[in-house]
Amino acid sequence: ACVGNSITYGYTLPDRETNAYPAKLQKMLGDDYVVGNFGKSGATLLNKGHRPYMQQEEYHKAIDFAGDIVVIHLGINDTDPRDWPNYRDFFIQDYRALIDSFRVANSRCRILIARLTPIADRHPRFESGTRDWHDEIQLAIENIAKYAGVQLIDFHAPLYPYPFMLPDAVHPNVEGAEILAKTVYEGITGDFGGLRMSPLYTDNMVLQHGKPLTIQGTANA
């Protein structure tokens, strides 16, 4: 079950039924999985926000779906000046209530929560509060993952270097949706494409004698 806002829904994407990240995730995972898209445009995580996810039809459908795996990406709309400045103190408890509700629906479900996708600096409210509130919500999400015992995945870092993938400063284009799907796929399967090293590490690289060298890369979990 993919739970979220318009980014999960696939808002602004041509043919969202094919190009939204949950649809792309379905193709990556194959027929052994059934992926449901329960994104609601404009939804907030905050239950006192302007459009609380837990009060939407999509939430109830996600609960009825009772998925074995639940992927949650919520918080972008909570940067609205109607929401975070007034109700920030409820964010962690509301997020934990959402997590707990999926555990009630399926006691064996595995839950992944995502760090927020970037908001580009051309967003009209970027410097008037959105940037700082976005950072505060990111930190809250990281703490929730730690204390609620759920898996944290990162929707921010893979998109951050590519602001052109956010044409309206918020919603990923088709290429960006592909990156989100790949991030979820890696988080679910532990398949990161095998051992991959930075292109800096080549057969002819020069090493400094007698100095420790930290070599970094990615590998399957």
Regions found by a protein language model. Give the residues of each.
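Proline-enriched interdomain boundary motifs that mark the N-terminal boundary
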Residues: 194-200
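Short hydrophobic segments within beta-strands
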Residues: 3-4, 38, 114
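Conserved SGNH/GDSL esterase-like catalytic core that processes O-acyl groups on lipids
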Residues: 7-96, 132-135
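Aromatic/hydrophobic beta-strand junction motif of beta-rich domains
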Residues: 213-219
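Short, solvent-exposed loop/linker segments at the N-terminal edge
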Residues: 205-209
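Active-site segments of SGNH/GDSL-like serine hydrolases
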Residues: 73-79, 99-135
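Catalytic His-Asp segment of secreted/periplasmic serine-dependent ester chemistry enzymes
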Residues: 13, 116-193
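Alpha-helical scaffolding segments of alpha/beta enzyme cores, especially the outer helices
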Residues: 90-93, 97-104, 136-143
